[in-house]
């Protein structure tokens, strides 16, 4: 599918229209957007706004705080990128927008989207820069000295350059927290609150995520002012276009079952999720020995190696990516049509993030869960949480891959 066909599948009726001022606007031309921003939107490949874009962009441009929930693959990054770019004054080469992401890979991907959509707004091709771990701080300081309008980064590095006085926060207009549920979890919460200490009191705050647990919504009261809320009904929290199945299997037979799957059907690209680094390495080694083109990554790898792996997978040079939950959030690879949970995720929210790797932007996709006897209860919890049914894998499942 071409970029021009990017219309997200999330249903109009999936949203809780519980707040005034949230109404779908079915055309980018009808939104309050600069002409040069519209040029960038259409040049990027968007034609018709997705459901979340129809609802979130206009409230974003009005300058108030916003909490927006949208499933993976439904145009969430485009929604906040467009809203953010409309809010900035490109006559001034000052830092005005800050986007925080939980991983280096997601930050790099987000910065690319913002740069491409905003290419006709700025005279500088470098108006949007990334600030992430695994790179030299001195390089970041040089970027800031040269002038940046939008900074996209991970909390640790952004906090560092703020404390050094290199990233001046007084001119900031907008803060976006992408994958907000992860950003406000225990792992990042302290860093996020530390960054907030340096931000202008009147800064616009926008939260975007596929899941918005109640505890996260409760936390937002600490730093948001009467936000517009665009939330998805719980029963809608499963991806259209994704067929979900399970295979009952004993732990020691999972690898053989995996090999059988790859011999049964032709798969464009696939992602296999396992819960430990050791298991990721083991699965990748066994698949490589069977002449599959396999990449693998996990959080303990150097960030430069992880970036190289993602580039290899995106380019199609590698057909299989074996990983931990590191890439479960937001990494956009267009040709993935099957996701295999070699291990079920320990976190129910991560199930949705994982299966969102397949069937993006309305294409068919399949999610297959390997379920041992001890996993049955967790599978039922996932079904109950998302009001969905996960059926046993049928013999003719190749039909679900569009074969």
Swiss-Prot record:
Motif, DEAD box: chain positions: 178-181
Placement of sequence motif Q motif: 26-54
Domain Helicase ATP-binding: 57-230
Domain Helicase C-terminal positions: 241-401
Enzyme class (EC, first level): hydrolase
Keyword Lyase annotated: no
Entry superkingdom: Eukaryota
Keywords: ATP-binding, Helicase, Hydrolase, Initiation factor, Nucleotide-binding, Protein biosynthesis, RNA-binding
Ranges in coiled-coil conformation: none
Binding residues for ATP: 70-77
InterPro entries per UniProt: DEAD/DEAH_box_helicase_dom, DEAD_box_RNA_helicase, Helicase_ATP-bd, Helicase_C-like, P-loop_NTPase, RNA-helicase_DEAD-box_CS, RNA_helicase_DEAD_Q_motif
Protein biosynthesis as UniProt keyword: yes
Region: Disordered, residue numbers: 1-29
GO cellular component annotations of the record: cytosol
Subunit-structure text: eIF4F is a multi-subunit complex, the composition of which varies with external and internal environmental conditions. It is composed of at least EIF4A, EIF4E and EIF4G.
Family: Belongs to the DEAD box helicase family. eIF4A subfamily.
Protein name as it appears in the record: Probable eukaryotic initiation factor 4A
């Amino acid at each position: 599918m071409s970029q021009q066909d990017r219309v997200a599948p999330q249903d109009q009726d999936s949203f809780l229209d519980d707040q005034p001022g949230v109404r779908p606007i079915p055309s980018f031309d009808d939104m309050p957007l600069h002409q040069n921003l519209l040029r960038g939107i259409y040049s990027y490949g968007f034609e018709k706004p997705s459901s979340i874009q129809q609802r979130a962009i206009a409230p974003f441009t009005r300058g108030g705080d916003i909490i927006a929930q949208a499933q993976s693959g439904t145009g969430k990054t485009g929604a906040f990128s467009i809203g953010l770019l409309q809010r900035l004054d490109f006559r001034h080469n000052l830092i005005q927008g800050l986007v925080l992401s939980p991983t280096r890979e997601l930050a790099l991907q987000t910065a690319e989207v913002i740069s491409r959509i905003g290419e006709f707004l700025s005279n500088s091709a470098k108006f949007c820069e990334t600030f992430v771990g695994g790179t030299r701080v001195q390089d970041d300081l040089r970027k800031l000295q040269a002038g940046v309008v939008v900074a996209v980064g991970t909390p640790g590095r952004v906090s560092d350059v703020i404390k050094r006085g290199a990233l001046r926060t007084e001119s900031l207009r907008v803060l976006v927290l992408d994958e907000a549920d992860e950003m406000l979890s225990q792992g990042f919460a302290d860093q996020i609150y530390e960054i907030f200490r340096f931000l202008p009191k009147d800064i616009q705050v926008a939260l975007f995520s596929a899941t918005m647990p109640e505890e996260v919504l409760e936390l937002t009261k600490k730093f948001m002012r009467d936000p517009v809320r665009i939330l998805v009904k719980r029963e809608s929290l499963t991806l259209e276009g994704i067929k979900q199945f399970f295979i009952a299997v004993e732990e020691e037979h999972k690898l053989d079952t995996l090999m059988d799957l790859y011999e049964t059907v032709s798969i464009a690209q696939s992602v296999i999720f396992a819960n430990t680094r050791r298991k990721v390495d083991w699965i990748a080694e066994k698949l490589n020995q069977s002449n599959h083109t396999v990449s693998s990554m996990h959080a303990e790898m150097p960030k430069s190696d992880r970036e190289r792996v993602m580039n290899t997978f995106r380019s199609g040079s590698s057909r299989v990516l074996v990983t931990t939950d590191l890439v479960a959030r937001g990494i956009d690879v267009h040709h993935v049509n099957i996701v295999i949970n070699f291990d079920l995720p320990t976190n129910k929210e991560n199930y949705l993030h994982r299966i969102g790797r397949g069937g993006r932007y309305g294409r068919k996709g399949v999610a297959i869960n390997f379920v041992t006897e001890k996993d049955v209860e967790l599978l039922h919890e996932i079904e109950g949480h998302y009001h969905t049914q996960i059926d046993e894998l049928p013999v003719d499942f190749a039909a679900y891959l569009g074969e």
